[in-house]
């Protein structure tokens, strides 16, 4: 089954959910209709596992802008399959969870699920794109849909702030990504990702390789909340909990990691890439794990834990990047192990972190708070969530018999492998191992700290907002199913790695099925070795620190002096002040000022173009025949135009302006263009009448006398504009070697069936221009409608 059917099916479901916005009786079912989308996607990707295992890729391509190699090009490979299954299967759980979380009466269900579907569609688009520009389009669509979902409760100031902050950071990162993709196109001449991966060595030798790599890293780090771009993720927790469980733990924040996995065969050829990604990941890991301990909000703890876990995965992506330089031998086996560990932990993290977010959402929904200072003793009210969150948190901490233990062991194995690889030198390698172990200890500490503060201790009824607390079964079901997966993966890990991780590894390493021979076999017991010793140290030290130390007091003092968020706010306010000054300087409500700026910029661009390429070779200048009438009209237009500069009376100015317009119409008539003359006459008549009628609405403000200095400037600018236009006409006349585009439009009848060439141009050849012009008119009309129906609401909140 082609990818087009999957994408088409998702679009149809989105349209049906959109229809429920306007059909009141169907609004309550919007969530269940939307649930069909992740179910459909899950079924599709599960059905493709046998094909991908046998090396068969599902491909689909429609030309879009083939001249610049921008096409609707989709390709499902092993890496895309793994991410597609995570997005769709976690999506089934989250969509069902959201139907129980949101209120039919209070929340706009169609709007929420439409945004969620748009996000899922965009995320799937990223992982199956085989064209860099197409991937960028979906990349920015995830930012837009994330903005809409975070600001879903738009009356909440925190939601607005979180949405704006995440949008600014991720969109700027997206622009950096686009810059990197453009550089790749300059280097190779193609935007097709599968072709780019075959040219990795020639790309790495190009002068633009390092700038391109930096741009791609900025795009990945901003999307995956890596230090110092992590600040948007905690603020995004203002979104409804289903959004946090889906976007900000399991899917969207993995997009940057997906990008680096995808381009590892190219980027891994640089040692700088390995250094940057590894150390950024480890710094993010330890920063997130320490910062999680100063949070009182359960979602805040999970936000920083997500940042920490993403850093852990990112460090493995960086360490394993050396596979691009060593595709065979013992080193290839070690790099393969590291990349395998990163992919395996990515899957495990999606499961246990989504379960944790769902548990927190249920507590918040039923108890009315997420503040751990008010939630002690919750085990008696939420026994199922106590079990779910305990298993999920301990899995994240790396406790045996849970899936997180296996991938944490492989992470430690990766750190130990760094010693064997001698990638960083002995000193840096020791630092790498130390950071990884210390960050893992803090991961254990905040996992136990979260459970202790929420479920242990005595319940205080006075601190909890809601008095009738219960734990609905349907609400808990998705989290329970995810919890069950945690020990299952521990006991049968190779079933999942062989069907998901291994196909993805083939693409990440770019070795194909030959990587199967060196891929690791996951075992629950490897004997007593260094990774196991690290795990024991983490558990023992973590327990002592979690139970004996007051982390809230310590971390608050340490981190408050180094707040990245405050730096972001200062930079944001600085840009806001600067942009305000610029806008006030440019937008001074003087139309002639706007016209002068526009004319000067237009003329400067023409002058710059002439300076760069020079004027065309001068041929004989042909002047059209003209008679006395043309000369009289030309003199009259010039005289009236100069007079307009000095006249102050409004009515006189409008009449003189009309005279110029009618004179131009006569010019068209003399040049044998009656249709243009008629159009000019109609437009000039209508605008003149509108000007005169509008005078009755304008205030009777005395007009100042003409200022010769200002009027002289206007005359000079007018001559500059006239010179620019004449120059363009001159250039057009000298372009004898260039074929005129007007000949193409003579095919109007054959290509469009239209007998009127103007209609054919507007409706076919320039259809997009016409459509967007119509959209502009609609937007302008909506603005006018709003102004006409505006009511004075001073003293009220401007957003109400």
From Swiss-Prot:
Keyword Transmembrane assigned: yes
GO cellular component: plasma membrane
Tree of life domain: Bacteria
Keywords in alphabetical order: Antiport, Cell membrane, Ion transport, Membrane, Transmembrane, Transmembrane helix, Transport
Lipid bilayer topology: Multi-pass membrane protein
TM region(s), chain numbering: 3-23, 29-49, 78-98, 109-129, 133-153, 167-187, 202-222, 249-269, 273-293, 300-320, 337-357, 387-407, 428-448, 472-492, 527-547, 596-616, 627-647, 651-671, 676-696, 712-732, 768-788
Keyword match Cytoplasm: no
InterPro entries xref list: CPA3_Na-H_Antiporter_A, MrpA_C/MbhD, MrpA_C/MbhE, ND/Mrp_TM, Proton_antipo_N
Signal peptide: none
Subcellular location: Cell membrane
GO biological process per UniProt: monoatomic ion transport
A GO molecular-function descriptor: antiporter activity
Family, similarity comment: Belongs to the CPA3 antiporters (TC 2.A.63) subunit A family.
NCBIfam families named among the record's database cross-references: PRK12646.1
Subunit structure: May form a heterooligomeric complex that consists of seven subunits: mnhA2, mnhB2, mnhC2, mnhD2, mnhE2, mnhF2 and mnhG2.
PANTHER family, A to Z: NA(+)/H(+) ANTIPORTER SUBUNIT, NA(+)_H(+) ANTIPORTER SUBUNIT A
Name of the protein: Putative antiporter subunit mnhA2
Protein's organism: Staphylococcus haemolyticus (strain JCSC1435)
Lineage, broadest ranks: Bacteria, Bacillati, Bacillota, Bacilli, Bacillales
């Amino acid at each position: 089954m082609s990818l087009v059917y999957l994408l088409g099916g998702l679009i149809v479901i989105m349209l049906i959910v959109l229809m429920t916005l306007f059909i009141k009786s169907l609004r309550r079912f919007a969530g269940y209709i939307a649930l069909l989308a992740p179910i459909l996607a899950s079924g599709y990707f599960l059905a493709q596992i046998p094909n991908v295992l046998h090396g068969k890729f599902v491909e689909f391509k429609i030309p879009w802008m083939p001249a610049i190699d921008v096409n609707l090009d989709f390709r499902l490979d092993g890496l895309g399959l793994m991410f597609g299954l995570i997005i769709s299967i976690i999506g089934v759980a989250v969509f069902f969870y959201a139907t129980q979380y949101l209120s039919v009466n209070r929340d706009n269900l169609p709007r929420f699920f439409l945004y969620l579907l748009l996000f899922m569609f965009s995320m799937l688009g990223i992982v199956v794109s085989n064209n860099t520009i197409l991937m960028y389009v979906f990349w920015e669509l995830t930012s837009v849909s994330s903005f809409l979902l975070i600001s879903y409760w738009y009356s909440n100031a925190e939601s607005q702030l979180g949405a704006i902050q995440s949008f600014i950071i991720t969109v700027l990162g997206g622009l950096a990504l686009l810059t990197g993709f453009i550089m790749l196109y300059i280097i190779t001449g193609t935007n097709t990702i599968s072709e780019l991966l075959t040219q990795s060595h020639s790309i790495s030798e190009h002068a633009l390789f390092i700038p391109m790599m930096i741009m791609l890293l900025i795009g990945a780090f901003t999307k995956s909340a890596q230090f110092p771009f992590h600040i948007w993720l905690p603020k995004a927790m203002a979104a409804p909990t289903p959004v946090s469980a889906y976007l900000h733990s399991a899917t969207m924040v993995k997009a940057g990691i997906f990008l680096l996995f995808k381009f590892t065969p190219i980027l891994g050829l640089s040692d700088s890439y390995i250094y940057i990604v590894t150390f950024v990941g480890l710094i993010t890991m330890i920063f997130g794990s320490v910062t999680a301990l100063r949070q009182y909000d359960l979602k805040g703890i999970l936000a920083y834990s997500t940042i920490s876990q993403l850093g852990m995965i990112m460090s493995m992506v960086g360490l394993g990047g050396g596979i691009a330089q060593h595709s065979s031998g013992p080193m290839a086996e070690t790099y393969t192990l590291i990349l395998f560990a990163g992919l395996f932990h990515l899957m495990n993290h999606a499961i246990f972190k989504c379960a944790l977010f769902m548990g927190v959402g249920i507590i918040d929904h039923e108890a009315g708070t997420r503040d751990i200072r008010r939630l002690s003793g919750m085990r008696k009210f939420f026994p199922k969530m106590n079990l779910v969150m305990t298993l999920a948190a301990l899995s994240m901490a790396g406790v045996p018999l849970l899936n997180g233990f296996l991938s944490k062991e492989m992470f430690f194995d990766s750190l130990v492998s760094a010693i064997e690889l001698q990638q960083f030198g002995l000193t840096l390698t020791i630092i790498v191992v130390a950071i990884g172990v210390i960050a893992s200890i803090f991961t254990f500490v905040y996992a136990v700290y979260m459970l202790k503060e929420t479920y242990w201790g005595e319940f205080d009824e006075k601190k909890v907002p809601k008095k009738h607390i219960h734990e609905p079964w349907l609400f808990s079901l998705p989290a329970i199913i995810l919890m069950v997966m945690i020990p299952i993966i521990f006991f049968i890990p190779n079933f999942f790695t062989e069907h998901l991780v291994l196909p993805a590894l083939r693409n990440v390493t770019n070795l194909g099925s030959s990587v199967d021979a060196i891929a690791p076999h996951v075992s629950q017991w490897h004997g007593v070795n260094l990774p196991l010793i690290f795990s024991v140290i983490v558990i023992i030290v973590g327990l002592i620190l979690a139970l004996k130390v007051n982390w809230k007091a310590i971390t608050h003092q340490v981190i408050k002096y180094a707040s990245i968020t405050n730096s972001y706010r200062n930079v944001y306010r600085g840009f806001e002040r600067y942009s305000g000054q610029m806008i006030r300087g440019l937008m001074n409500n003087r139309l002639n000022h706007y016209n002068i700026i526009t004319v000067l910029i237009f003329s400067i661009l023409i002058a710059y173009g002439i300076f760069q390429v020079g004027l065309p070779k001068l041929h004989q200048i042909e002047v059209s025949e003209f008679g006395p009438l043309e000369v009289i009209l030309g003199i009259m237009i010039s005289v009236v135009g100069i007079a307009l500069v000095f006249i102050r009376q409004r009515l006189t100015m409008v009449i003189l302006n009309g005279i110029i317009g009618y004179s131009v119409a006569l010019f068209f008539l003399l040049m044998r263009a009656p249709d243009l003359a008629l159009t000019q006459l109609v437009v000039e008549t209508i605008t003149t009448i509108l000007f005169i009628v509008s005078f009755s609405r304008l205030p009777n403000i005395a007009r100042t006398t003409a200022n010769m200095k200002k009027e002289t400037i206007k005359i000079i600018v007018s001559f500059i504009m006239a010179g620019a236009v004449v120059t363009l006409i001159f250039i057009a006349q000298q372009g004898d070697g260039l074929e005129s585009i007007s000949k193409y439009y003579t095919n109007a009848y054959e290509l469009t069936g239209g007998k009127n060439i103007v209609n054919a141009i507007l409706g076919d050849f320039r259809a997009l221009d016409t459509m967007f012009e119509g959209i502009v008119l609609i937007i302008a009309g909506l603005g006018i409608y709003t102004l006409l129906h505006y009511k004075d609401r001073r003293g009220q909140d401007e957003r109400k």
